[in-house]
């Protein structure tokens, strides 16, 4: 379903979020949505497949007709090629010390 305020002539917000998530986590993302209206609710379609770089490798599909999209994905590339350069290694450079306690990595009483 479209996000409130979404311009129907622009790319679906969900697709932009998929691209950002794929890039930030160095993973391939396949996002599928149906098209048309069900129970009075519209669906935006525009399914897509995104590379670990954040760029689409298939799609977006049609916003108003059924369509199947395909892409080749070398899953080994997510590990082998995710380090852009020595100063930009997204997963290595995460600051888990900032949020690990909140996620339960360091259990201590009363943090919540």
Q: How should each PLM-predicted stretch be described?
A:
Residues 65-85:
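A short, polar/charged loop-to-alpha-helix boundary motif
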Residues 78-112:
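Cysteine/selenocysteine-centered motifs that mediate thiol-based redox chemistry or coordinate metal-sulfur cofactors
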Residues 21-25, 53-57, 73-75, 83, ...:
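Glycine-rich loops and low-complexity Gly/Arg-rich segments
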Residues 1-67:
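CN hydrolase (nitrilase-like) catalytic-core segments centered on the catalytic cysteine
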Residues 35, 39, 64, 71, ...:
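Flexible domain-boundary/linker segments
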């Amino acid at each position: 379903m479209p996000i409130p305020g979404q311009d129907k002539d622009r790319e679906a917000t969900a697709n932009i979020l998929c691209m950002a998530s794929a890039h930030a986590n160095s993973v391939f993302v396949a996002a599928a949505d149906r098209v048309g209206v069900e129970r009075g609710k519209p669906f935006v379609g525009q399914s897509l497949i995104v590379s670990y770089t954040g760029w689409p490798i298939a799609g977006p599909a049609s916003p108003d007709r059924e369509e199947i999209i395909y892409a080749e994905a070398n899953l080994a590339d997510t590990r082998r090629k995710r380090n852009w350069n020595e100063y930009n290694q997204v997963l290595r450079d995460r600051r888990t010390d900032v949020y690990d306690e909140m996620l339960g990595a360091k259990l201590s009483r009363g943090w919540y």
